[in-house]
Amino acid sequence: MTTMNTNANVTVKSVLWFSRHTMTDDQLSDLKRIFGEDIIVHQVSASATSFRDVLEAGKDDDVLAVVLPPAMLADLTNPRNNQKPVIRAIANRVPTGQMVVNPATGREEEQFKFEHAGWERVIKIEVVTEKL
């Protein structure tokens, strides 16, 4: 097991994967590289309406791996709301070399795929807005 640098120096045994998408083999292999081969991944395939949904789903997990909009990510990483580490996958958008028809436009365009490029810990998200 790897100890992640957190306020509590948590030994990571279980990771919540909160995403509508199944974790890829590359993502899982990389998590095992980071946290150890014995890591348990708890998948929740849902859409969150609030950061509280993620906290509830991950109440028994040590790390929260998420795919969330910026405002919800800001709430989840706020130390008043959550003390657990929050991580997210990094992906590269790579051309496949094939052309496909975009159903929205009817035009032919280059096809892309996403390749896992690592994990990052989200320390803080700041959302600054201005009403128009």
Q: What spans do the regions from the language model cover?
A:
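Long, low-complexity, Lys/Arg-enriched
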Residues: 1-62, 74-132
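Acidic beta-strand-to-loop metal/phosphate-binding motif
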Residues: 63-68
